[in-house]
Amino acid sequence: MIYRKIIWGILYVTLMLFDTHRAQECEEMTDLNFKDSLAGTSLKVRLLLYTRADPSCGQLLSHQEPFSNSQFNVSSVTTFLIHGYRPTGSPPVWMKQFVEFLLNRRDMNVIVVDWNRGATNMNYWQVVKNTRKVANNLTDLIQKMKDNGANLSSIHMIGVSLGAHISGFTGANFNGEIGRITALDPAGPEFNGRPPEDRLDPSDALFVEALHTDMDALGYRNLLGHIDYYANGGADQPGCPKTILSGSEYFKCDHQRSVFLYMSSVNGSCPIIAYPCESYTDFQDGTCMDCGKFKSAGCPIFGYDSVRWRDTLVQLEQTRTYFQTNKASPFCKVGYKVDIVSWNQKTHWGYLTIKLSNGTEETQVELNHKSLKFERFQETSVLAQFERDIQPVKKITLKFCPRKGLRPRKKLRLLHIRLTPLQNHLRPLCRYDLLLEESKDVTFKPIPCEDSNF
């Protein structure tokens, strides 16, 4: 008995020593604080390598000899994760999970570019100046990778905020031969209105994509890539605070949402379809559902898998796309194109609420982005995006609310209504001859539409 205890004791001590040694070898992102931001920090770039061999353990790469004593495989795909401005000095809360999702998706090198010393500074303009220096540092590493047999087309740079422009500067140093740049809400301040050489642009990589979530504040407003996604119009993300009373979340929620949206695409939680469109209003009106220029591939899927549309996108002029999301994961919504023909003698204006039910579950959307116009025998179209998929749809409830200030009470007479699913190939749902009284629910059982057109 005593020998067994001795053996177990030796094993326990050995394991503890191994864990301690491993903890000493594993590197974490630089963790600073607000005092550091007030004092300002000098730039120091640290490169942390993560692989499937030990996905939770970051290896600090030597700038001089990055491939010695490391698990770096230059023949594999390499993804760089580059953070942005860090006014409080703390590491990004999403970084570890982002690395995990990437390594779960495929075998690759993930390099976290830790430039927290240099990004932590109350002087934003000084941080902007540092972006060129970070890009030069990464250029040196990538050149070493290339010299050791790496293919530039196998490099994917994911840049958040200022990190997006760092990716662009790095790609420009290789004449756009880097495989892919993903820009997550690229920084706007100090970059809006700048010429292509002073910001990210499509020539910086073989494929450049940009996601916009805070273009009215911290993000960039205009097109930057071969394809640009404007989530929920590119500003004011659902679930984010609308007033400063919510504290720091008011400033960072919209901007940071870009990261979580892209992470969800890497994790494959649910696909988000991006519709090419000239404006968010046109998108909401349901006039941009045609993706014929992508032929059999259909509309692009936002995120990690968008590379499937690369060959078509790089041949087109810069493509602007829109989509809507839920306020939390799963972010994808389920879309229907709604077409209505009314037969009132007079023109009516108002808003619609649509509820779908399968008998046990319900999902509802309020179409209130603008007052809809209903003219006699004229088709009114709008896009309805629901929080989740309800199948089979057994009941539909409509509510019509006239535009404020219009009296007496209105009744909207529908010759027919048609709901066409956008995410699947189910047959459109119809109903004929309905009377909607002001602010009253009208529930009916839909039927398969008689033909493909009204």
From Swiss-Prot:
Keywords: Cell membrane, Disulfide bond, Glycoprotein, Hydrolase, Lipid degradation, Lipid metabolism, Membrane, Secreted, Signal. It is an enzyme of class 3 (hydrolase). Its EC number is 3.1.1.-. GO terms for cellular component: extracellular space; plasma membrane. The active site is at S161, D185, H255. Glycans are attached at N73, N137, N151, N267, N358. Residues 1-23 form the signal peptide. It is a peripheral membrane protein. CDD domains: Pancreat_lipase_like. GO terms for biological process: lipid catabolic process. GO terms for molecular function: carboxylic ester hydrolase activity; phospholipase activity. It holds the Pfam family Lipase. It catalyses: 1-hexadecanoyl-2-(9Z-octadecenoyl)-sn-glycero-3-phosphate + H2O = 2-(9Z-octadecenoyl)-sn-glycero-3-phosphate + hexadecanoate + H(+). Disulfide bonds join C240-C253, C277-C288, C291-C299, C430-C449. It is found in: Secreted; Cell membrane. Hydrolyzes specifically phosphatidic acid (PA) to produce 2-acyl lysophosphatidic acid (LPA; a potent bioactive lipid mediator) and fatty acid. Does not hydrolyze other phospholipids, like phosphatidylserine (PS), phosphatidylcholine (PC) and phosphatidylethanolamine (PE) or triacylglycerol (TG). Belongs to the AB hydrolase superfamily. Lipase family. This is Lipase member H. The lineage of its organism: Eukaryota, Metazoa, Chordata, Craniata, Vertebrata. The gene is liph.
